[in-house]
Regions:
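Structural detector for internal amphipathic alpha-helices that build alpha-solenoid repeat scaffolds
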Residues: 204-207, 292, 300-311, 322, ...
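Amphipathic alpha-helical scaffolding segments comprising HEAT/armadillo-like alpha-solenoid repeats
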Residues: 235-237, 241, 271, 285-288, ...
Length: 460
């Protein structure tokens, strides 16, 4: 999110899922909290375009813009920044653009400490409440009032939150660990809008810190003892900043302004964070329309969740199988991704798909993964799936992704041998896949084997 440059500030998707599961009685949507990366292993790939982890968050309902705009003017941080700007008037500042004696305004304005004053000063200057020119601070061009358009007030609020979160690099909350994991904590609270218990938040931060920062046991023991108190202080500050409030159950959750601001940040980072209205339009699409929209990238991953929830698992699977059985590799790949969201309730149409020449291998794999009776796949079947997987990515128009996908198909397996075996499977896109590998694969031996295999396939 805003502090994504910090290497310790990571999204541990597995831990987010487990944290959400601990809600127990929460809504299905909240507990599912579909937080999936499009390519979870891309961090190990050097291909262009790989390595960017895109997350999908459940749809949210935002408060109306006019209500949000009115709430901005009541945020304690905003009110104090206005007071500081008024107190400053016309005043000399240091060469760094700071107030020369931070203790004076702290005493006169009742600001608890210089760190809080610095946050207020950053917000006041960056948002235009205060202007600094030639070593002198004066009143800035921004005059906040309820007369401003909602869009202007929300734009101001967006800037305030970016300033707040950027301060995490310089001890925003007073806890270095909370600062390091602030973005993922806010994203988790965004995904579970009803709130999370402090104990759950502490557990998530500890687990993420241990994994992402490779913390030693002694550090973890000390952190386990100190973090609950540090988190309480951090939540109090975030409440002062207008981001956090307590739910009816006493659990911290994002305020309506917090939901709006965190969503803006997620969208800036390229994540899928839709509103309910944005994805509701996909519920009534047919399977063919949904698959086409996904392939054209006009439907975000969250649209799949809405589409599946609007029909029974069996009905959804039957529609999807029909598309995949008669469609292209690109359609099969897209359908396969959607089918992975379904459980054993969809068994009947998947079992029926075992009679479809282009679909039976995927159906067998789907059944096997869910511990349901299924025919065994031979090595030749695995090679066919490899060809089809690469072909699906070609249909989606991303050759670099295809290179990454090929490297991940069979970790540790001799890729040259797999390429050579591709000529023996009956797949309409075999030559196109071999041409792709021959032209773009980073391993010279694999590329050479692919070009040779393509010539062999053409000679048949």
């Amino acid at each position: 999110v805003a502090k994504s440059g910090n290497t310790g500030n990571v999204f541990d998707l597995g831990e987010l899922r487990r944290l959400v599961d601990e809600l127990g009685s929460g809504s299905r949507e909240a507990r599912a909290a579909v937080l999936d990366a499009t390519s979870p292993d891309d961090k190990d790939c050097d291909c262009p375009g790989c390595g960017t982890e895109v997350l999908t968050f459940p749809p949210v309902v935002l408060a109306p813009d006019d209500e949000l705009a009115a709430a901005v003017l009541r945020v304690p941080l905003v009110l104090d920044a206005q007071r500081l700007a008024a107190w400053t008037g016309t005043r000399e500042v240091t060469p760094e653009g700071l107030l020369p004696d931070p203790f004076l305004p702290c005493a006169e304005l009742g600001v608890p400490n210089p760190a809080r004053l610095h946050l207020l000063w950053v917000v006041a200057v960056n948002t235009g409440m205060v202007r600094i020119s030639r070593g002198v601070a004066t009143a800035g061009p921004l005059a906040l009032s309820a007369e401003l358009p909602s869009a202007a007030l929300l734009g101001f609020w967006d800037g305030v939150v970016m300033d707040v979160l950027d301060r995490a690099d310089d001890s925003l909350t007073g806890s270095s660990v909370v600062d390091d994991h602030l973005a993922e904590m806010l994203a988790t609270m965004y995904a579970v809008s009803d709130g999370l218990s402090p104990a759950t938040l502490v557990k998530g931060i500890l687990q993420s810190h241990e994994v992402a920062c490779e913390a030693r046991p002694a550090e973890m023991r000390a952190l386990t003892a100190a973090l609950p108190g540090e988190l309480q202080g951090a939540l109090s500050l975030l409440g002062y900043c207008g981001l956090i409030e307590l739910s009816g159950a006493g659990w911290p959750r994002l305020t309506p302004l917090g939901m709006w601001a965190v969503r803006q940040d997620l969208l800036r980072e390229g994540h899928d964070a839709p509103t309910g209205a944005e994805v509701a339009v996909f519920a009534d699409l047919g399977a063919a329309e949904l698959v086409e929209a996904i392939m054209k990238r006009s439907a975000a991953p969250s649209a799949v969740t809405v589409w599946l929830e609007s029909r029974s698992p069996e009905a959804a699977a039957r529609e999807l199988v029909k598309i995949a059985a008669s469609g292209t590799a690109g359609q099969r790949g897209t359908v396969g991704t959607i089918l992975e969201e379904l459980g054993p309730e969809a068994e009947v149409p998947l079992r029926e798909a075992l009679s479809e020449p282009a679909m039976w291998r995927y159906a067998a794999s789907w059944l096997h993964i869910r511990d349901l009776p299924a025919p065994a796949l031979t090595p030749a079947d695995s090679t066919w799936i490899a060809v089809d997987t690469l072909a699906s990515l070609i249909h989606l128009g991303n050759a670099p992704e295809a290179m990454c996908e090929f490297d991940m198909l069979e970790p540790g397996e001799d890729l040259v041998r797999v390429v050579e075996e591709m000529t023996s499977v009956d797949h309409p896109d075999t030559i196109a896949v071999l041409d792709l590998l021959g032209a773009h694969h980073s391993d010279a031996a694999v590329g050479k084997a692919a070009r040779k295999a393509a010539m062999k396939a053409r000679s048949r």
